[in-house]
Amino acid sequence: MAADWEEIRRLAADFQRAQFAEAAHRLSERNCIEIVTKLIAEKQLEVVHTLDGKEYVTPAQISKEIWDELSVCGGRINIVDLQQIINVDLLHIENRANDIVKSDKAVQLVLGQLINESYLDQLAEEINDKLQETGQVTISELCKAYDLPGDFLTQALSKRLGRIIHGRLDQENRGVIFTEAFVSRHRARIRGLFSAITRPTPVSNLITRYGFQEHLLYSVLEELVNTSRLKGTVVGGKQDKAVFVPDIYARTQSNWVDSFFKQNGYLEFDALYRLGIPDPAGYIKKRYKSTKLLFLRAACVGQEIVDRVEASVDEVISSGSWIDVATLLPSSLSVEDIGILLQQVMRSLNKNSSGLVFSDTIVVSEKFISSCTDLFSDMMKQKAEKEMKNSPVHLITEEDLKQSYVLENSYTNKKDKKDERRKKATEGSGSVRGGGGGNAREIKIKKTKKKGRKDADSDEESQATGTGRNKQLEFHFMSQEEMQDVLKTHLQDCPEELITELAEHLMRPLTKSYQEVVRSVFTSSTSSSGASGRQTMKDLQEEFSNLYNNIRLFEKGTKYFTDETQTNLAKHLLKTVCTDITNLIFNFLASDSMMTTENYSTITSEVRTKILGKLPEDTRGPLTKLHTSLNGKSLEDFLSYLDAAADICDIMVKKGDKKKERQVLFQHRQALIEQLKVTEDPALVLHLTAVLLFQFSTHCMLHAPGRSVPQIINFLSGKIPEDQHSLLIKYQGLVVKQLISQSKKAEQEDDNKTEEEEGADTIRKELQEITTSVKDLVLRPRKSSVTEE
């Protein structure tokens, strides 16, 4: 029992100790941070942690510390410095600084610095001390000294003028502050200096020499002049050109200007400038406000001179003569000024259509120009008649055709000699225009209608040609130098420069008139030669028929070859026989516009394009297609365009019959044989022999270029005996070697030709030995060879 009570007392004592014991549990730092973070997130607590993250600061504490630092620093502190002192992020410093500026009008935020009114008052006191010492201060100097913007400083100091700062701000140049004593001292200096001036003096020189403040000087000077304290005027504005002119000098100056103008009727700007007037034009306008003056580049003239020139020009225009206005005006006036004066006079007379200005100073009437034109009338007619006799061709002259032909020949001559010789051979084979014109059906040819034809030199016609080169050809009348010689003979009193410009002016109209005279002469000549034109119509019909049938027969011969060879043969036909028949049509159509040439084969692509530009719309389209197809590679297209062109020109094409074809084949073969007999050129012999053997084998004519000879020889394999074909192959190889050796010989130097010459001689001898045998393949065919029936 006693033990139980003892246990109870012990438990009671433990309970009592537990009741009176203190709690020893505390929150950890991490728990504190989490709690504060949660409170900040729920916006129940507004604090800012420091940059080192060890402390929290309230915004109110930041504001308090900013105020304290601003006071300690004398009313001006940089926000960046506050960040280092308060040890929080710059963003929080800026936010609190903006709040302080909004809440307190006495604090301003300028260029990242907090500035209060007490600092500005202290600043104004310092500036005032400096102002009283120097007499003037400039805002720009203060900006550099105190590191503050000019506008802010000007505004802050303006509020303290008269209160803290004893001075005034220059009203025209608000960047300077003066004291009254400084202004009075400068006014006295300016008054004394300008009172002593007796001649025009540039103000800028005085500023530099005596060290005046520029804006202050101009304002004081203007005040003294307006109050008549200084007798004079400032001309040229408030710039570097400003000049102070004393009244005594101005009166003398004005008297001279008035006297000169009264006596001469004009004023030179350069003379006034030498008198010390920096702005002569402005001075004259100001002095002679009510006087009617004409201002030129370097002078001005009075109405009296203008009236005198106007009367002289009017008389010249009425009498049909000319005059050099420079003789009526002062010699000091420049040519440019005289030209301006003349333009004004011509506008006032309103007779621009009756008179022209040459050389800037000479007025020439239209009547005088017409009389000069008449001097060339007889010359035009005589020259046109002479040209018609010497060159009875027309808007496309023989000379133009010759020039075009020479250009083409110059290009052809640059080719290899082999191609040149073979070209001659093919021209020989294609130039035979045989055919029984008597057996053919008559071809009816009628000239195209002229209805709707437009003038050849119209813009629309020019555009339709599709090239800027197809301009109407002009007959040359006279060169400008020749015209000058004629004018000098008849106008001996005219100056040289007038003769030159007059000839230049007449060049185009005289040339145009000459074209009309030539047209007239040629038209009369054409009408008189109509009978002879009808006489040649039959020849034209026969030649067209022969060419057309030849093209058809040559086309048959191309069908025996591969596509590539056919294309080459077609191109050659288009460049030769097809071009001939195209030129024949173009030459015939061109006769309507007096555009013919006796030798139509000399017509080039350029000349055909020019002829197209003269044709009416309904004819031009088909003829353009025909002209373009010559540059293609399809005989079918060309023949279809040829048929269309023949329909447009009312040329009825009749294909030849079998009898006529045999006759043409025979004539063509005989022509080639005759050519083969007389030639000794190995390349030409090979070419003619191959073409004749082809005709013997196929009974078809062939018009081929030299480069197609190997293909013809390959075709003959199996068509002629093997020994004949082998002879052709051998002869072909020798011809190729000869051409190669000739080419190398032309490229090598003279001292390296011995070996090449020996090889060439060997080849030449071999060719001479078998040339006769090759010719005999055609001239003396064996019975075993295939011959034409």
From Swiss-Prot:
A Pfam family reported for this protein in Swiss-Prot or TrEMBL: UFL1
Keywords: Chromosome, Cytoplasm, DNA damage, DNA repair, Endoplasmic reticulum, Membrane, Nucleus, Transferase, Ubl conjugation pathway
Documented EC number(s): 2.3.2.-
Main location class: endoplasmic reticulum
Protein origin, superkingdom: Eukaryota
InterPro entries in the record: Ufl1, Ufl1-like_C, Ufl1_dom, Ufl1_N
Record's compositionally biased regions (Basic residues): 444-453
Region (Disordered): 407-470, 743-763
Gene Ontology, cellular component aspect: cytoplasm; cytosol; endoplasmic reticulum; endoplasmic reticulum membrane; nucleus; site of double-strand break
Subcellular localization: Endoplasmic reticulum membrane; Cytoplasm, Cytosol; Nucleus; Chromosome
Coiled coil feature spans: none
Biased composition (Acidic residues): 748-760
GO molecular function, one term: UFM1 ligase activity
GO biological process: DNA damage checkpoint signaling; DNA repair; erythrocyte differentiation; hematopoietic stem cell differentiation; negative regulation of IRE1-mediated unfolded protein response; negative regulation of NF-kappaB transcription factor activity; positive regulation of autophagy; positive regulation of reticulophagy
Top EC class for this record: transferase
Positions of region (Required for E3 UFM1-protein ligase activity): 2-212
Its biological purpose: E3 protein ligase that mediates ufmylation, the covalent attachment of the ubiquitin-like modifier UFM1 to lysine residues on target proteins, and which plays a key role in various processes, such as ribosome recycling, response to DNA damage, interferon response or reticulophagy (also called ER-phagy). As part of the UREL complex, plays a key role in ribosome recycling by catalyzing mono-ufmylation of RPL26/uL24 subunit of the 60S ribosome.
Subunit structure, as described in the record: Catalytic component of the UFM1 ribosome E3 ligase (UREL) complex. Interacts with E2-like enzyme UFC1.
Family: Belongs to the UFL1 family.
Name of protein: E3 UFM1-protein ligase 1
Gene: UFL1
